[in-house]
């Protein structure tokens, strides 16, 4: 039972356990515990199935009381009153959690407030076990209070909001979210909520004015409870017609009898009206006299239809009559939006007729005979090869064969062993030194799928070079197999005459890596190779607009603080949507590389190339990089190291994962929205190490929304596992791209000079910054100014 004795609150549970205890003061109760003072709210934690007894102390013994739960008078049959001053709750459950208060029946004065929280029942045990557990156990505490300093958050409608309460305790505490004092699970919120318990966060996408209020996180275990409250204010947006998420226009082709789903995600400040329509023909015509199409309504809003149900159109066991055009139509008081997709229904595949057994036996025997004949021919040919080779290379003093080992970033569970020889190269040279005196004397096995005759390749102007390799523009005839006479502009990677065996190994390794990765729109794809009768040429896609960093800098709007050429107008003015599109395309490319188990390790704007039609393509993902023998504090002869793009675990522990690539992607986002700015401008490398360890991060760029900056900060999470995946980044950026206006130009008053390096870039004669294709070390060391210049771009 529960009794009040001089300030002592002892709640007795079934079995005689004490759930919570308040301090006891000898003699008279202190002012904090006077019966008439309800300013103190006791918090009590119970397990499911317990029995709770709550008492209410009154000024006089004859005063009767009334009990309330969350402000509502309660008296269910499972509860009992003893003189109405003792409330007993039997076999408690989660629903019994809440704020209990008692009032004098003839008065509105609250005599007592008690918050009851019900969690999973702790395992029972003897007193000794409890004592041992209590020695190592502790109450919850917030682990990152600096993340919780901003208590008031004001955002425009349709943005994404995240509240975080990172905490720790033993046993691991639970977290519950309240909105305006009541438990909040988002059941009645359009779009719902995301509760990420591993990140101790509450996420609400596409917020609307009705989301305003106070949000409280309650973190508790059986040793204590802590809470923190945030205030959210949602600013009204300009009304607009419904916005339909990109991606619906995906035509479907299925076999008759299959099930089909069409999805239509709708964003609207005003309540939208959603309909699914199927286009039909009337008297052989698809359109009426007024020019509008004939349609039949498949699904529309109803009393018992939820928004989520309306966003999906199911077609069960489709027939040929179901084929045709389907449209999702969404409207509100401002206007209408619609997307359409086609459904094609195919007949089932005809079963293969049974073949006579004797015919099968004869066919099998014929195949075996052909295989045996081919083996004999190959064996005979191999036997004759040594004598021919000896005759052709009689003047060679030394023949050296070495296997090329993969040095690319593939995860250990890849289907290819990282030490598997990919290509065996015969080096024919009269020199015993380590240099290749004549690259043309190398012999590589031809790959028919990729081999291109040198006669069909016309080399053009140089595009860039490094210490050991160079890239030139060229015209290749016959790259497109279906157009054998068409010339295509390509970029050709090749070695210099003084390249070493390792340089050749790296270039061949990159070529083989690109073969294995496959093709994607947002990566630089392999087009072919010249491996016979001359030096090794690797043909890749040509990006006419150069790398993304210089592309953005060339398009900075002119202004009084423009630090480059104030007399030169930018080639074209970028909109905010253009920048989001750049980020989205790079995320798509990285999502594909991650799906192929490829870790880039040097993702930055300088390693993203831009084609003539503004397609972003990730480059240098197949490079061999020695990440274990680099001194990050020293400049090497191969250029500068990219410490400003590296995740802390890669920088300090040499650990490279997809999560470290996500960190680099966050820095690349910052580069995009500063139009090619240099990260951490004016921060010396030694100071940068210290700032990163202390949790400091770059501030929000001027032309970046709060939502996109939150994506950057998520990429820069100190714990790699709590950073978003590239798949999640693609989804987030797709949503941002969908709701972004196409005519939202950048703020011309922003001084982009603040994002420029504090000292000029200094390239060595062998800098790999321009030609990282042949770099053995990672390119680009941060610029080291003489004086620290923070420029207000570092924040905690």
UniProtKB/Swiss-Prot annotation:
Which cellular compartments is it found in?
A: Cell membrane
Keywords assigned = Apoptosis, ATP-binding, Cell membrane, Disulfide bond, Glycoprotein, Immunoglobulin domain, Kinase, Membrane, Nucleotide-binding, Phosphoprotein, Receptor, Repeat, Signal, Transferase, Transmembrane, Transmembrane helix, Tyrosine-protein kinase
Q: Which reaction does it catalyse?
A: L-tyrosyl-[protein] + ATP = O-phospho-L-tyrosyl-[protein] + ADP + H(+)
Segments on the Cytoplasmic side according to the record's topology features? 380-796
Q: Which residues form the Ig-like C2-type domain?
A: 21-119, 140-233, 239-344
Q: Corresponding gene?
A: FGFR3
EC numbers: 2.7.10.1
Q: Give the protein name, as stated in the record.
A: Fibroblast growth factor receptor 3
Lineage of the organism: Eukaryota, Metazoa, Chordata, Craniata, Vertebrata
Source organism of this protein record: Pleurodeles waltl (Iberian ribbed newt)
Segments spanning the bilayer are: 359-379
NADP is among the record's keywords: no
What is this protein's function per UniProt? Answer: Tyrosine-protein kinase that acts as a cell-surface receptor for fibroblast growth factors and plays an essential role in the regulation of cell proliferation, differentiation and apoptosis. Plays an essential role in the regulation of chondrocyte differentiation, proliferation and apoptosis, and is required for normal skeleton development. Regulates both osteogenesis and postnatal bone mineralization by osteoblasts. Promotes apoptosis in chondrocytes, but can also promote cancer cell proliferation. Phosphorylates PLCG1, CBL and FRS2.
Q: What is known of its domains?
A: The second and third Ig-like domains directly interact with fibroblast growth factors (FGF) and heparan sulfate proteoglycans.
Tell me the SMART domains matching this sequence: IG, IGc2, TyrKc
What the record says about activity regulation is: Present in an inactive conformation in the absence of bound ligand. Ligand binding leads to dimerization and activation by autophosphorylation on tyrosine residues.
Q: Where is the composition biased (Acidic residues)?
A: 125-135
Give each disulfide bond as a residue pair. 56-102, 165-217, 264-328
Tell me a Gene Ontology molecular-function term this record carries. Answer: fibroblast growth factor binding
The entry annotates sugar attachment on 91, 113, 214, 251, 283, 304, 317
Q: Which residues form the signal peptide?
A: 1-19
- Modifications the protein undergoes after translation, according to the UniProt entry: Autophosphorylated. Binding of FGF family members together with heparan sulfate proteoglycan or heparin promotes receptor dimerization and autophosphorylation on tyrosine residues. Autophosphorylation occurs in trans between the two FGFR molecules present in the dimer.
- What GO terms in the biological process aspect are recorded for it? apoptotic process; positive regulation of cell population proliferation; positive regulation of MAPK cascade
Query: What top-level branch of life does the organism fall under?
Result: Eukaryota
Q: Where, by tissue, is this protein expressed? A: Undetectable in the adult skeletal muscle. Low levels of expression were detected in the liver, lung and kidney. Medium levels of expression were detected in the heart, spleen, intestine and eye. Highest expression is observed in the testis.
